[in-house]
Amino acid sequence: MSDPPVALIANRIHKRFLVKETGKSTQAVADVSLAVQMGSLTALVGPDGAGKTTLLRMIAGLMTADEGRLEVLGIDVAADPQAVQDRISYMPQRFGLYEDLSVQENLDLYADLHGVPQAIRRKRYARLLEMTDLARFTARPAGKLSGA
């Protein structure tokens, strides 16, 4: 039996940011390597400031790595970030959800913005809501979710 195709390959990813107040740089992501198989569920867990959001933004093609190579669905993220953005989405809880809209309304808004066909939304929403354990909160305003 062969292994499932790889959805993500990260090879020795590094990212630094300049701290304006000090003029020094700080390491946000240091030497991260991983492979995620298609169809698998993977979680990034770590304390505040560990680089989780930075790594996700690089994977989604919203930010470039300083070093290393990222490949998403066979696409070199550095070479063609728009192709990655056309295939995947990144929606953070903070600054990504409209707090006055319900969870369902936020899903519909982002699906509209990314051109997700109506025919596949129901199945996709069900999977996302199950993965995030938010199915029972679809009518709740995003600003009233725990952690919001």
In which residue ranges do the predicted regions lie?
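ABC nucleotide-binding domain signature
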Residues: A43, I88-P92, D108
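The feature captures the beta-strand-to-loop junction immediately N-terminal to the Walker
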Residues: V45-P47
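Helix-to-loop junction immediately C-terminal to a conserved catalytic motif
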Residues: A60
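Conserved ABC transporter NBD signature motif
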Residues: G68-A79, A83-V84
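Conserved ABC ATPase "signature" region
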Residues: D108, D112, A119-F137
